[in-house]
Amino acid sequence: MVTQILGAMESQVGGGPAGPALPNGPLLGTNGATDDSKTNLIVNYLPQNMTQDEFKSLFGSIGDIESCKLVRDKITGQSLGYGFVNYSDPNDADKAINTLNGLKLQTKTIKVSYARPSSASIRDANLYVSGLPKTMSQKEMEQLFSQYGRIITSRILLDQATGVSRGVGFIRFDKRIEAEEAIKGLNGQKPLGAAEPITVKFANNPSQKTGQALLTHLYQSSARRYAGPLHHQTQRFRLDNLLNMAYGVKSPLSLIARFSPIAIDGMSGLAGVGLSGGAAGAGWCIFVYNLSPEADESVLWQLFGPFGAVTNVKVIRDFTTNKCKGFGFVTMTNYDEAAMAIASLNGYRLGERVLQVSFKTSKQHKA
């Protein structure tokens, strides 16, 4: 692909600066640079199959690079279609904009501009969208949301087997206020072709009140309880039985051994704090174990959103560090969708960790 890229450059940039940028899409950049950002560029509309090495080779042909990063989805590892390049010399950064902005690569026309320094106004602007018509394309979703502001990235989740939309997507706006306006304007509305209203919410915006109650209960429970090895082993087999019920198959002993005795023991006092399994008017609650310390609610949204309607996600955090304690909860409205999520995600490798996923039931958490 590098040869194709360089060939495209030779055929396109000989006549001078590229043409105008596309009107919509991930345009997090400025036309002029500030003193602090004369060397740092953002590159949008990259082909999804472009690799880190190809990205570096393309921009390294302009001048010496201090760093470059092709941004990838944390879950799938796939390129999100944009990246950052930091040059050693401001002149090279300026040359890269004049040379590569508007370059056509495969079906994409890339956009190269100065990266804007981060600020509070542009953070936390990522939206989770569910209930989209299965026929809606990514471009149509962008058109629906672009009336509220500048879109940085967008994505519709597809079924890996069929390639058909799961009706779930993510939209990242340039500014948080734009995301807020999109929620006000589109949440609960029926776009063209939709049978039901869509849900639009922040991808990492769970109920804070419920979260604090959960954290307090878990902290107090873990501080006052201790159980011996026999109790831990019993809890493991309880979980194994639950997994058998969920999948209809017998779990291997290696699966049981991967559960953390400490985490499972700490879970035993959580019944009755709004996360009990079963219908119970609140949906079906799923226990997710072996999350990394850096995991947040957006990870759970992205993992479970493709399988059906998710009403709530919760990552349990350490009081001192605010890091994930290794587990969390997801509530889904439909049993079949919840069971499918469990069957698909239990044993799923997320980074260097293998997730353990099961239904949470009142029996599971008896002392």
UniProtKB/Swiss-Prot annotation:
Question: Which Pfam families does the entry link to?
Answer: RRM_1
Database matches in SUPFAM superfamilies: RNA-binding domain, RBD (SSF54928)
**Keyword Repeat on entry:** yes
Domain RRM, residue spans: 39-117, 125-205, 284-362
Instruction: Give induction info.
Output: Up-regulated after spatial learning in radial arm maze experiments and in Morris water maze experiments.
Its keywords, alphabetically, are: Developmental protein, Differentiation, Neurogenesis, Repeat, RNA-binding
Q: Name one GO biological process term.
A: nervous system development
Q: Signal peptide position in this chain?
A: none
UniProt note: phenotype after gene disruption: RNAi-mediated knockdown results in reduced Gap43 mRNA levels and impaired learning behavior in radial arm maze training.
Q: What is known of its domains?
A: RRM 1 and RRM 2 bind cooperatively to AU-rich sequences in target mRNAs. RRM 3 binds to poly-A mRNA sequences.
Which PANTHER family does its entry note?
EUKARYOTIC TRANSLATION INITIATION FACTOR 3 SUBUNIT G
The record's comment on protein family reads: Belongs to the RRM elav family.
Q: Describe the subunit structure.
A: Interacts with MAP1B light chain LC1.
> What is the protein's name according to its record?
ELAV-like protein 3
UniProt source species: Mus musculus (Mouse)
Taxonomic placement: Eukaryota, Metazoa, Chordata, Craniata, Vertebrata
* Gene this protein is translated from: Elavl3
